[in-house]
Amino acid sequence: MENPYIKQFPDLMSGKKIMYVHGFLSSGQSGTVKMLQDLMPNATFVAEDIPVHPEEGMEMLLKLQETEKPDLIIGTSMGGMYTEMLKGTDRILVNPAFEMGNTMSSMTGKQEFQNPRKDGVNELMVTKGLIKEYRDITERCFQDITPEEQARVYGLFGDKDPLVHTFDLFHEHYPNAIRFHGEHRLIDKVAFHYLCPVIRWIDDKQNGKERPIVYIDFDALHDSYWKATSSMHKAYEMLIEYYNVYIVASAPTNDHEYMAKVQTWVEVYLSTPAYNHILFTNQKNLLYGDYFIDPHPAEDFMGTTIEYGSDEFKTFEEIVTFFDRLGGQ
């Protein structure tokens, strides 16, 4: 149900089904499911309690995938580990715990579930035997990965995650390894700013949708001290909801470090939504798109140029107003 009091994306995954795979000591009644439902009110969510023993858990999830035929599967932590093995469906793994045996090694003894389960069980004993079961199941990850599967899977990794560190392991097998600003849990801020843009890419691909292209010159994003310009984040967040946004920077032949500096800046200030959305070129006029926000527009750009810093567009606030009036056109 749409809620006028919170920011939502009613068009995102509209009419589609999302399967959520929860983490260790959680359940299908996790607050994360409600949070995602609030963000995408016109999507249907499927989330079930995963059995404690991993063999049973994997069997249940495979049956659920076959029965429900979800359009997208999102798994967090332990659920991310399971989700990697649910082949044939578009998938997002958030801080996937591919090394569950090591992660659980400090958790031996009685543990309480963080969310209510349908079976009424509220605690479990973590034993060496259970840890071995999880270590064994993780050895099945990353098997028989085809190019088609690589294109279906995205991994999101918090740059401040204190529990799981599997970015490099994931990236050995899948190209779409993306960092975000956050810790281990999928909180609302992370879902809104980082998860939803990735879901939008997947949704567009499934729908065969091509959004209008907006280029933003890198020099419009930062000041002389390389700090973000006023209202830049506000404008960027608004634009990525409706447009395919690319950052354009120069590629100085005699300064190779500049490109690395730009990539680092974009990762720090824009993060996940800008993944694979940076273009380096010394010939901006050759780019083909719909709009170009640029302090020094190319005269022969085959689209609409917006001169950032001009009397008409002094700041990004004026640019927000301009695009708001366009309504995503």
Listing of model-derived features with the role each one plays in the protein:
Residues 90-92, 96-202:
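The alpha/beta-hydrolase serine catalytic core
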